[in-house]
């Protein structure tokens, strides 16, 4: 259940974290062991139930590729989620596929050891990087920002008197305020429309950059909830296109599902910044439990 009163958490923190010095930056930081080999301890703070969030994992691999490639901004990144990642030690291995004047392409994989001591690949990524600041200013688009009510009229997990279904450790690290028209699932009255919209930010006040956008596309409750489904909705594949560097301030995220078939659905996301620019688009294929 959600209540109408807004919590103090909706206001900006007294001391805002900065890009490069925030919980997100610390928890996605890697230690280079050798060229193309990185160690990381995946934080339990970015989990849903016990599984590590896919957007957080994408940001981890995205950061490894920043160190590997000569260009620093992800333009397009596609990930296949092979097995569920767990909090704890992991190894990321990267390779350069091709380098060019404006774009560089690389691949990365994250590995962990299973209970039998075998190394298991968790996620594999192929990505192209460039320089977002070098792109021309010309924009020709029919896309429009989502019509989300003002932040003070939206609601987050902390607004209810009891934990919201699907709440997680991830939610504690975010400033997430959902459009009331996409909250029917939390009241036991899902709309059936397969839509989710929200204001998105970090609880510590950190502004956004291309790596945090990789988290934003996969941080909202699943659209499956508004379709009347419950339970875990694991990502099979996720592709993100980063279109420009985000302006300071919260992001608006809109996610839509049009087709659920055979136990799978797509989630198409748009991420808009405070300047009204479309900063990222994504599509993911996810598995759902029917019945």
Model segments located where?
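Terminal targeting signals and extreme-terminal segments of soluble enzymes
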Residues: 2-291
